[in-house]
């Protein structure tokens, strides 16, 4: 667990890191971050609580408790990952643990959108390829350098062509996934727009 506070920002071209494998279909958002942790006033503490109940239940042998995975940043999952409630806390918890990209068979739509909105790309692969990658990552440390533009995961031994929605790809390459930075970089346009909105005249005074 890195609890990395260097969060994604602006255009993202590449993501490098070690893979961590989490096996199981239909892993829902309540398993990713249990409901009792949603009372937090910000997301900063969520990283330590990701998969809290699963980790407690199997007492230290969860992939997120393994010392071998403490610096992992690329999560490999199975089908329908992130189903259940639409809580944005789930991708926020994963990001604060250190996850910067997810490769899976499929994702719940809202979870996918919430990931994109905070700079975590979600790639898809066929079932057998996911199983192969999970097996490799469990046997030995598996590292990838992922090219967003090429939708390609590479290392010294092999490469894997990933599936990534073209609309999402462009958001990452252009940095437009990052709404906050986009707004801050265009304050002049915002101020100009305010001049033409009569119901915001109090801001101009």
Residue ranges and their predicted role:
Residues 119-204:
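Acidic, glycine-rich flexible loop/linker segments
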Residues 2-7, 33, 40-143, 147-148:
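Feature captures the catalytic cores and cofactor-binding loops of soluble hydro-lyases/lyases
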Residues 15, 40, 54, 67, ...:
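Generic signature of intrinsically disordered, low-complexity segments enriched in small/polar residues
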Residues 1-35, 179-205:
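N-terminal, positively charged, Ser/Thr/Ala/Gly-biased leader segments
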Residues 27-29, 58, 169-170:
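Short, acidic Gly/Pro/Ser/Thr-rich loop/turn segments
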């Amino acid at each position: 667990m890195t609890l990395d506070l260097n969060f994604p920002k602006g255009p993202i071209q590449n993501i490098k890191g070690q893979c961590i494998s989490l096996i199981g279909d239909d892993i829902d958002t309540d398993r990713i971050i249990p409901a009792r942790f949603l009372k937090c006033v910000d997301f900063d503490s969520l990283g330590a609580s990701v998969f809290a109940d699963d980790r407690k239940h199997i007492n230290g042998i969860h992939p997120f408790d393994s010392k071998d995975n403490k610096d992992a940043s690329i999560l490999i999952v199975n089908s329908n990952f992130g189903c259940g409630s639409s809580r944005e806390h789930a991708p926020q918890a994963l990001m604060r643990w250190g996850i910067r990209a997810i490769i899976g068979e499929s994702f719940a739509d809202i979870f996918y959108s919430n990931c994109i909105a905070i700079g975590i790309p979600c790639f898809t692969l066929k079932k057998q390829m996911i199983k192969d990658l999970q097996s490799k990552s469990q046997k030995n440390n598996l590292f990838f350098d992922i090219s967003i533009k090429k939708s390609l995961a590479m290392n010294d031994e092999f490469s894997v062509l990933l599936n990534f929605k073209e609309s999402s790809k462009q958001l990452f390459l252009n940095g437009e996934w990052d709404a906050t930075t986009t707004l801050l970089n265009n304050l002049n346009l915002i101020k100009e727009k305010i001049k033409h909105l009569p119901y915001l005249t109090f801001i101009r005074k």
